[in-house]
Amino acid sequence: MKIDAILSPAELPALAKRDLRNAICVVFDVLRATSTFVTVLHHGAKAIVPVSEIAEALAFRQKQPDILLGGERDGVRIRAAQTGGVDFDLGNSPREYTPEKVRGKTIVSTTTNGTRALRACTGAQTVLAASFLNLTATAQFLRRIQPAQIVLVCAGTRENVATEDVLAAGALGEMLANETIAQNLKVGRAVPCPPRDEANIPVQQQSHGAHGLSRHSHATAEVSRPTLSDSVETARNAWRKAKFNLLEVVSEAENARRLLAIPELHDDVAFCLRQDVYNLIAALGRDGAIRISI
């Protein structure tokens, strides 16, 4: 098993040209797209469809009036002045997406970097959306199916590296490469990590035909030592240094500083850095929608 990492959005065009047919790509946009995606799914949404542009989201609404529109620009929910008359139902704060609002719904969410990263992976066997919130579940899935190649994809911020994405990729790389942790993943034991606020929640038993996923994918495989690229080692080293004061480290980064400066979004940073709150796999389907898969 070979593990590589894309740490900067500048690398995404090259990723899109790679042969990924035997690869699983894991996309991180911790603040906040992929954290919101897994929260939405945990709270009972049917699916979430990521798009890049406001116009794409509005086109979905015209075809399906019952969908919810989610998204932000500069951290703030999209309003009628930006769309020509339509207020979006939700922003990009995972705390907005309560069960009461999203259960049974399909959400179309406009997010620039997150969508760009997901689309760069469309040639992959499987594309997963991951965050700190569902990190161990994602690692357990990868260890079970033992793909030939894993690519950890950091969405970044605009054209820049995002500290929180690199740290999440490093944490997942550590889970997959550390033999003690890997053995625990193989047998389904909990993986030790810094304290968090909530206990694990059982996986929702659904399957929606995502990229390369099937029920037999969870057969237990022998744990083998993966081969790591330099970029994965870089992310692992960053994670090891930051993991015991994660909030403090991330709060100094660009994305977090922007959110912390907006009173109603201040708490999103700590929310998105909690580990293993949701025990689910979020997979991108061939139809462009992200759903829970087993």
Predicted regions, residues:
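Structural motif
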Residues: 3-5, 23-26, 46-48, 66-69, ...
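Residues that scaffold, gate, or flank divalent-cation-dependent active/transport sites
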Residues: 6-15, 19, 34-45, 55-61, ...
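N-terminal glycine-rich anion-binding loops that anchor highly charged ligand groups
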Residues: 23-37
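Short His-Asn-centered micro-motif
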Residues: 28-30, 51, 109-111
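Long, charged alpha-helical interface segments
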Residues: 80-106, 110-116, 120-126, 163-181, ...
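Short, structured patches in soluble enzyme cores that scaffold and shape functional sites
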Residues: 109-113, 131-132, 152-156
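Glycine- and Gly-Pro-enriched alpha-helical subdomains that act as flexible
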Residues: 133, 137, 141-146, 159-177
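Intrinsic disorder/low-complexity segments
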Residues: 179-226
